[in-house]
Amino acid sequence: MNVLVVEDNVDIGDAVSSHMVADGHLVDWCVNLKDATCRLTSKKYDLVLVDLGLPDGNGLSLLRAIRREGDKTPVIIMTAQDQYSDRLAGIEGGADDFLVKPFDLDELSARMKQIRR
């Protein structure tokens, strides 16, 4: 599976990317919305993992842009923001799942498998 990870925290981005590579996935990792947008216009992904709090904006804007283009690529939000309003905004924006940091990497793998069904 080709996966785009959009995460500005180096420790989390490295852990998530390494875990997915170990599971046999191909991973591109971006730390901001600008780079993620460039990647999405040049390559097709099977899954996008996006943080809400990024240095150049909110991950919801990336999610909305993906959906506005009619792209059905599954998107999982992964964020430390655990307010009901954050979850609701993600779901209404078209996210397929929502993980609250810190999360177990095996839980991420399980949710990825569920989305692929």
Q: Language-model features: where?
A:
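N-terminal/domain-start alpha-helical segments
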Residues: 1-117
